Amino acid sequence: MSKDTTVSLEQLFKELDEYIINSQFKKAIRVCNKILSVNGNDSEAFQCKVICLMQLSNFTEAIECFKKPEQIQSMQFEYSYCLYSTAKYQEALTQLEKQSSKETKSLELEAQIYYKLENYQKTISIYESLLSKPGYSDSIEFITNLCAVYLDAGKFNECQELLNKNKSQQTKTHELAFNSACLAISKNDTKTAETQLKLAKKICTDSLKKDGFSEEEIKEEQTSIDVQLGYVQQICGNLEKSLEQYQNVLEQQVGDSATLVATNNSISVRSILQSDQWSTQPKEYTHAMDSLKSLLTEAESTRLNSKQKKVINYNLCLLLVQLKKVSQCEELIKTLKSKYGQQQQQVDTSFVEDLDIIQVSLLIKEKKFKDAEKLLLKNNTTTGSIKSQLLLAQIYLLDNNNVAKALNVLEKLDSSVSLRPGIVATKVALYEKSGDLEKAVNSLDDLISIFDKQKKSEKDEEIYVNLLKASGNFKLKHHKYREASDMFDRVLKINPNDLIALPSYIVATSHFDPSLSQKYEGKLPNIKFESKIDIDLIEKYGLTFEKKLNLNEDSNSSSPTTTTTTTTKSTKPTATEVVKIKKSKKKLPKVMKPNYVPDPGRWLPKWQRANAKAARSKKNKDIIKGPQGIASASQTASLFVQESKNTNTNNNNTQSSKSEKPRNIHKKKSKK
C-alpha cells in the first residue's frame, strides 16, 4: 500500500472517529464505505459500518453486510442481534448456540429470544442464573424483565416475592409499577391495579418531561398504561369509561402492540353497549370482523403473542355466529383446534374448550342436543370447566326437560362452585320441580351456614339478608312455618324494621303460635289513606265475584228455562244483588244495511263472478244470424205475425207504402 493511501486512510479514520463521537452515523457509514473501497478486508471499518447501521435500526441492511463466514465469526453477537431484531428468532438462536463460551450479553439475548418464542421456562432459568451474578440484582431493567416473564409464565408467587424485595424501586420506574399492576389484575385485585397504573402514568410523565420529551412522545409511551387502565374499567363493569379510554388510544394512531389490543377490546365493549344497534344493523358486525382480520395480518401479527392471537380468533368466531355464517365459523374452529389443540399447556386446553362451547351453541340452535352432549362429554367429562358443565346441564333441560340428569351434573360440581348463590338457586328450582323439597331446603341451609361462618362485608351482608328472605319465602310457600319463622326472625334481628320480613314473620308464626306474632304486631306501620273509604262499596264489590260463582253453579244444576223474580230495593246491598256494569253500545256505520248479504265472489273481477256468467248466457240465448236491423228471432216472428194480420183485415185497402213494410227481410245484399 502506497504512502498516499495510508495518509488518506488515516484521515478517513479520524473523520470516522469524529462522526461516531458526535452520533452522526449516516456520515460515518459513508466514510466506512470509502475505507472499504480502498481496503475491502479492513475489519475495523466493517465493524464500524455494522454498528452504525444497528444504531440507525437498519438491521436488514446490516445483515446484508455479512457476506463471508469470517465476518459472522468475528461479530457473532451483533449478527444474532440483527436476526433477533428482524424477528428471525430461530436463526438467531442457532447462531448463539454456536458460541463456545457465552458472555452475559449473549445469555441476555438468548433469554430474550426464548421469551419471544414463548418458552418461558428456559427464559426464567437463564434469568435466575444471571441474578446470582454481580450487578444484575440491582438492575431495575433486569428485575422488570424477570417480573414480566414470571407473569407470562403464570408464576405469580415468585413475581410477588421479587416485587416485595424491590418495593423501593416501584416508585422510580413506570415499567416496574406497570408490572405490579398486571400482577394485581391476575389476582382480581382491581383497586390495587388501578392505583398502580395511575402511579406508573405519573412516574412516566415526570421522568420523560425531565429528559426533554414532548407531550406527543409521552402519550405514545403511555399507550400500554392507558390500555391497561381501560381493561381494568372493563372488568369492573364501567364499560363507557373503558371505551372512552380505548378510543383515546386509537386516536393517537401509534401502531404498537397496545394499540392492537385496544382495537380488539373496543370491539368487544361496543358489541355490549351497542347491542341493540348492532342487532338491527349487521354492517356493524362485518365492520368489526374486518377490523379483527386486519390485526391478524403478517405485518401486524408479529407484534402480538399467541395468547393475544387466540383471543382475537375467538372474537372472530363469535362475530361469525352473530352473522349466522355457520360454515365459516366451523372452518375457523377446525383450523384453530388443529393449530392449538396439540399443545399441552393449560391455556391451550381452555382455549379449545371455549371453541367447543361455541360449536355446542351452534348445535343447540339447530336442536341437535345429542350431538352437543357428545361433543361436551368427548373432551370435558367431570374434569371440565364450570362453563362446560353448566352448558351440559342446560342441554339436559332443553332435551325433553331431563331434570334428573341436570341435577346430577350440578351435584358433581366442585364445592367452591356448587355453593355459589346462582347455582344454589338453580338447584332449588330443579329440586322443587322434581318434588324433592328436603334437598331444596338443605341446599339453602348449607349456603346460609357458610355465610354464618365467614366475615361479611357490607355487600355480603346484603346478600346474606336477601338469602334469608328467599329461604323464608320458600319454606313459607311449602307450609314449613316454623323454619320460615326462624329465617325471618334472623332478618329482624339484623334489621327490626324490615317491612318485607316483618309481615312474613307474623304470617308464619300465626300458623303455629299466635303469641309470637303479637311480638312484632305493634311494629307494623299504620295504613294511611289519602281519602275516606266506603266500606259498603268494598263489601258490594267483594260479594260480586262470589255471587257470579253461585249463579254459574245454579245454572248448571237447574233446567234450561229460567224464571226472573223482582225484589224491592233496599238501602243496603244484599248478597243476592249483582252489580251490572254498563257496557258501551257498539257503534255501527250509518250506511250499513242489516239484511244485506254480500256477494261471495266480491273478491274476484266482475267478469269472473257467477252472476256475470249467468247474465252472459241469458243474453246470448236469443241471438241468431239474420239481416241487419233485427236483433233476435222473437223480433222477426212478431213482425211476420203483424204483417199477416194487416193483410187479412184490410184486403180491400190499398197496399201500404214501402216504408210501412219491412224491407228485404229474407233478401241478401247483392254485391255490385
UniProtKB/Swiss-Prot annotation:
GO cellular component, one term: endoplasmic reticulum
PROSITE patterns attached to this UniProt entry: TPR (PS50005), TPR_REGION (PS50293)
GO process terms (BP): SRP-dependent cotranslational protein targeting to membrane
Polar residues bias locations: 631-645
Disordered as annotated region, ranges: 552-672
Domain-level remarks: The C-terminus is essential for the interaction with the srp68/7SL RNA complex.
Subunit note: Component of a signal recognition particle (SRP) complex that consists of a 7SL RNA molecule and six protein subunits: srp72, srp68, srp54, srp19, srp14 and srp9.
Protein's name in the database: Signal recognition particle subunit SRP72
